[in-house]
Amino acid sequence: MIDVMQIQEILPHRYPFLLVDKITELKVKEVVLGYKNISISDHVFMGHFPGHPIYPGVLILEGMAQTGGVLAFESMEDKVDPKSKVVYFTGIDGAKFRNPVRPGDRLDYEMSVVKNRGNMWIFKGQAFVDGNLVAEAELKAMIVDK
C-alpha cells in the first residue's frame, strides 16, 4: 500500500487538488487500485451543488489520472526522482458517467495499462462506489521533465 504521504512524494499535486488518498494495490506496468474518500467538507461542495451535493465528473477523471500517474512513475524502468518529472494528462476518450458520487462515498479507482511506449501511457480507467461503476474512460498521459 502507498499512503497519502508517499503519494505526495510521487505526484506534485497538493490539497485541495490531490484527489487520491491511498493506493491499495499496484502491479508494475499492469494495474493500480486506489481510492479517495469523498467528504462534505471538500471545497467543491460549496458550489456543486448547494443543497444537492454531487462530486463533479471532471474531478473523478482527474483522480483517475492521478492514480494512473502513480502507476506510471512506479513502473519506470530507470528509477528517477519524481520531483524532476511530471505526468501530463494528454487525452481522454469514451468518458461516461454512470451514477452520481456523493459525500460519504469512498470512490475507488482502477487503472489498467492498455499500452505503454517509453514515456507515453494509455490507461483504461474505471471508478466505483460500493462496487458499482460510476465512471469510466480511456486516459492518455506522458511523463516529461519539469
UniProtKB/Swiss-Prot annotation:
Record's catalysed reaction(s): a (3R)-hydroxyacyl-[ACP] = a (2E)-enoyl-[ACP] + H2O
PANTHER family for the chain: 3-HYDROXYACYL-[ACYL-CARRIER-PROTEIN] DEHYDRATASE
Gene this chain is encoded by: fabZ
UniProt keyword terms in alphabetical order: Cytoplasm, Lipid A biosynthesis, Lipid biosynthesis, Lipid metabolism, Lyase
GO cellular component terms listed in the entry, alphabetical order: cytoplasm; membrane
Chief location of this protein within or outside the cell: cytoplasm
The protein, known as: 3-hydroxyacyl-[acyl-carrier-protein] dehydratase FabZ
Domain of life: Bacteria
Cross-referenced SUPFAM superfamilies: Thioesterase/thiol ester dehydrase-isomerase (SSF54637)
E.C. code: 4.2.1.59
Annotated GO MF terms: (3R)-hydroxyacyl-[acyl-carrier-protein] dehydratase activity
Organism field: Campylobacter jejuni subsp. jejuni serotype O:23/36 (strain 81-176)
One Pfam assignment: FabA
